[in-house]
Structure formats: C-alpha cells, structure tokens
C-alpha cells in the first residue's frame, strides 16, 4: 500500500507522481490519496483553502484523468468533512484482477460534478464573487465592532486562517490579538502583524467577539468554548456564510436611539443586542450599533445579512406629527415602505426571523371618538403619519397571512417617559414649568387640549414587546392602558404638582397667584388636528399572556419633571 495525504495538490507534475507510484506498487497493491475536494471548496466559499503551497485543486474529474494516464483504475471514493471537505480515492493497477473499477460510483460523482458546472469557468467567477460577499461582511463587521469600542480577537492562528486574514486585509489595527492553544506559536505574530497569545491569557480578559479561523471545526469549538459563550462572548464564523453565534438569540432594534428602544435594551437582557440608528452615533456597552440611512435598501439588506437576527424590533420611524405633515413622501418611505422592505428581505432570504413592527393607534385617529378592538381593520387615516403607518401595518399582516411568517404588529398608544423628545406636549410643558420656576415667565403656546389620551410608560411598552416576540407565531396586539385621560387635566395637574395653580379664561391659562398668562391655546394650529379625539382600546390579548402596565399615570407625570 502507498498513501499520499494532504500533499497531492502541491505537486508540479501530478501525472508523473502517479506513474512513479505505479512503478513501486505491487500488482495487487492499493494507492490511497486524500486531499481537499474542489466542489466542497466551491460550495463552502473556502477562499482560505487557496494558499501559497497549493498548486492544484481537484475534483474527481481531474483525478480520473490522471489515473487514466498513469494506468490506474479507481476502486472506491469516500468523502469526509475534514478541513472543510475532503475526498479519499483508492486506486489499483489496471491489470490487477483482485479489484474492479467502481464504474457506477465514478459515473455518479462525475455526473454530479458536471451538473454543478465543473467544466464551466463561470463557477470559479461565481465562487470568487460569493467569497467576496462573505469577506465584505466580515470586514464591515470588524469595523463596526471597533467603532463600538468593543474587542474582537482571532481564534486559532492556522495556515488557512492566515490566508483569510491577508485576503480580508485584517491586521493588528483591526484585532489586537490572535488566540492560540499551540505553545510554539505564542509570542509570534500572524502574517498581518497580529500578536499571538495563549488561550489562558485571553480568558483572563476575554474579548466581546472571537473570529474563528479554523471554522471547519465549528461544532467542536462551540462545545469547547461554552464558558466564553455563556459569559456573553460571541463567535464570528466567516464561512461557509458569515455568521455570529452566541449562547443567546440575537435581537436587532431599529431606531436604537429612540425612547422606547432605551427601555427595550434594558428589558431584553436575554438577547445579544444589535441596533440600527440614523442620528449621531451613540455607542453603548450592551449593544452593537450600526449607523446608516435605513432607506438605503442595499445597505439595509447587507446589514441584516451580517447580523441574521432571530428577532427584529422595528421601532424606527418619523415620530413627529408636524414633521410628517410637512414631509409626506419622506414619511411614507420611512414609516411605510421601510417596513415592507424589512418584510421582503426576511422572506427572500428564507429566514425564520420574528418581526415586531411598532404600529400606532394613530391609524384609527380619523374616527375621532373610537374604541379600537383586537384585530381591528377599520383604519381611518387623515394624516401622512397614519397613512404611512397603515401601510407598514398592512404589509406585516400581508407577509404573515400569505407566507406564514412570525410577524407581529403592536398597535402602540400614547407613550411617555422623561426620554421623550421635548417637542411633544407633556415634555414641552415640563420644560416650561422648569423655566417658569427659574424665573422665566414666557408664555407657552399649545394646540387643542380637549383630546383624551390612553397613556403608557415606555417601560411597559418594552415589556409588552418582549411578551409578543416570546410567542411562537405572529399576531396583532393592542398595547394600551385601561383608562384614558383628558390632556387638559394632565397639563393642569403637572403645573399644580409644582405649585403653579392655573385658571382658564377663554383660550388663556393664567397663574392664579400672580395673574400672569402661562399658556395660550391655539385651537386651529394644524387644521384637522384641532379636532379633539378620544381613541381608546383594551389590551385583551396581551393581558391573557400575563402582561399588564405597571407604571400608573401619577408616576409617569412625576417622572417628567
């Protein structure tokens, strides 16, 4: 017997090598040869298999040609997963009567290779293109990790891994250390200048992410490094497709800088968190954030493909009614079309990602006085904000009902917290109270105060979202309180809580003690918005799942100032 293992692809003249083996092999002897399999390399995007010492890359088609020229017959072929996919071929001399050529197996494999396109140069162009896609995801993610002030190290300084580091142009600027269990490598550097440290050194101060270069041993590494994963660390596997793995599922929060998102991040501690924001970058310790315009569909799909989230909590939207009124096309894109794009990406990719879409009670506001029911399709919209939100809401239901995807709408009623933007009424009022108490007696101008609002604290909304995405299937839920409050009464109470008692005369609210005007009510500020509304509901489904609001209106008002 003659064996040649993991070296056949290094030969400058493989036919002559085979003839030399023929010359030393017994008449009924066997030559066994094992090396990486070309089709496995192509299928798994193993660009790291291509390195300086490899001159050839074989499928059975090429090996059969070599065997024929050297007067060998192939008696068996076996495949395995070693190093990303290898095959072992067993040869016998053609004149041997002890072994027969396995024509049925050979023809079956050759047909599979030809059907795959092994004789067509396009498959190699496609291979490089696919590898470049995965490497770009890796490269971009490493950049994001560093922008977030987090740490990513290399795991396993292997030969193939060094090929990937060079191809992706990843060096010591991107990753401070490479972690290695082989003591002979510790203290040295990778080809791109990354210092190699031991595993125990890494465990004393573990990074947030480990880029696994020996990715072929994925399952063994996940088991071996369970402690790292359980402590919150995450693995990055570059191939066959870029993937981030942790012990927790991944949740992606769009609109990660918003008010509700702040409380979602506190609530979703059982997830590895990722965020998408559009404002000035704000990087945090408990979440990895991406900042870009989500209306760029190519960047959006690229980012989602990097994260491959188990859950998407879609909160991003234009929230200002005034801005939406003056920018209807932009509002339709941000609050409607963007939701549809997220649904479409998940569907086309074949993911089983759960989606929570932040819908709004504003989609029923045109009814003026209305009690919203569960699964209520009687939307009535008179404003660009609610028109766009209705579109997003409807697209979520379309993808859920037609394709059976786990997509949910949460119809969120008025949400308050101290983190709400100051342009919104109650926060505008509290800021005015602070100014008034500090001696600035300027008058506050507001719109109609006769509407009723069903008000929740943002933390209760976050808990509702967690309850919703914990369900196996998608649905539509009302996220609301059991009672509504007149806006006028809330404004009066806020001032009263801080010793400013107001009286009303016509459209003026003045301070009883001084007679100074405090508020001017402008009823016709925005046309139809001047009409008092009372949109209410009952969160029947959520309460059946055990959710209920925990923060009462007194606490909400108390937090605001």
Feature roles, as predicted:
Residues 33-56, 60-62:
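Short, glycine-/aromatic-enriched active-site segment of Class I SAM-dependent methyltransferases
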Residues 251-269:
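N-terminal Rossmann NAD(P)H-binding glycine-rich loop of SDR-like oxidoreductase domains
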Residues 83-132:
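Flexible, glycine-/basic-rich loop-and-beta segments that form/coincide
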Residues 28-36, 234-238:
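Conserved beta-strand signature within the Rossmann-like core of class I S-adenosyl-L-methionine
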Residues 15-30:
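A short glycine-rich, Lys/Arg-flanked "PGG" loop and its adjoining helix->strand segment in the class I
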Residues 433-561:
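C-terminal substrate-binding subdomain of Rossmann-fold SDR/epimerase-dehydratase oxidoreductases
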């Amino acid at each position: 017997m003659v064996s040649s293992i993991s070296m056949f692809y290094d030969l400058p003249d493989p036919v002559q090598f085979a003839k030399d083996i023929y010359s030393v092999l017994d008449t009924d002897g066997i030559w066994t040869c094992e090396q990486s399999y070309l089709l496995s390399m192509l299928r798994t995007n193993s660009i790291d298999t291509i390195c300086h010492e490899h001159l050839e890359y074989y499928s059975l088609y090429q090996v059969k040609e070599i065997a024929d020229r050297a007067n060998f017959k192939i008696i068996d072929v076996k495949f395995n997963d070693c190093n990303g996919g290898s095959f072992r071929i067993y040869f016998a001399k053609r004149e041997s009567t002890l072994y027969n050529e396995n024509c049925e197996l050979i023809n079956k494999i050759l047909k599979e290779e030809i059907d795959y396109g092994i004789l067509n140069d396009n498959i190699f162009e496609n291979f490089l293109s696919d590898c470049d896609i995965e490497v770009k995801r890796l490269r971009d993610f490493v950049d994001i990790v560093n922008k977030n002030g987090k740490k990513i190290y290399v795991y396993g300084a292997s030969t193939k891994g060094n090929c990937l580091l060079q191809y992706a142009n990843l060096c010591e600027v991107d990753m401070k250390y490479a972690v290695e269990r082989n003591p002979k490598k510790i203290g040295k550097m990778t080809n791109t200048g990354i210092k190699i440290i031991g595993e125990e050194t890494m465990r004393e101060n573990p990074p947030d992410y480990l880029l696994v270069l020996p990715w072929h041993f994925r399952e063994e590494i996940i088991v071996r490094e369970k402690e790292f994963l359980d402590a919150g660390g995450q693995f990055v596997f570059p191939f066959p497709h870029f993937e981030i793995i942790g012990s927790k599922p991944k949740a992606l929060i769009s609109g990660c800088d918003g008010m509700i998102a702040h409380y979602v991040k506190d609530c979703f501690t059982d997830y590895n968190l990722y965020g998408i924001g559009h404002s000035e970058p704000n990087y945090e310790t408990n979440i990895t954030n991406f900042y870009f315009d989500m209306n760029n569909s190519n960047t959006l799909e690229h980012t989602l493909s990097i994260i491959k989230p188990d859950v998407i909590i879609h909160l991003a939207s234009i929230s200002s009614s005034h801005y939406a009124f003056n920018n209807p096309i932009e509002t339709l894109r941000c609050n409607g079309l963007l939701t549809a794009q997220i649904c479409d990406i998940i569907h086309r990719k074949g993911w089983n990602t759960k989606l929570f879409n932040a819908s709004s009670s504003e989609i029923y506001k045109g009814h003026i006085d209305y009690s919203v029911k569960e699964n209520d399709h009687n939307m009535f919209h008179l404003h660009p904000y609610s028109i766009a939100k209705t579109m997003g809401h409807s697209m979520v239901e379309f993808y859920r009902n037609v394709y059976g995807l786990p997509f949910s709408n949460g119809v969120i009623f008025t949400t308050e917290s101290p983190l709400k933007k100051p342009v919104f009424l109650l926060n505008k009022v509290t800021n005015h109270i602070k100014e008034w108490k500090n001696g600035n007696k300027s008058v506050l101008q507001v719109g109609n105060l006769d509407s009723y609002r069903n008000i929740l604290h943002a933390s209760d909304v976050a808990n509702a979202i967690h309850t919703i995405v914990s369900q196996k299937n998608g649905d539509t839920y009302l996220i609301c309180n059991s009672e509504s409050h007149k806006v006028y009464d809330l404004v009066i109470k806020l001032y009263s809580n801080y010793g400013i008692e107001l009286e009303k005369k016509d459209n003026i609210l003045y301070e009883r003690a001084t007679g100074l005007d405090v508020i001017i009510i402008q009823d016709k500020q925005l046309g139809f918005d001047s009409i008092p509304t009372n949109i209410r509901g009952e969160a029947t489904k959520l309460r059946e799942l055990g959710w209920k609001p925990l923060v009462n209106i007194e606490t909400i008002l108390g937090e605001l100032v």
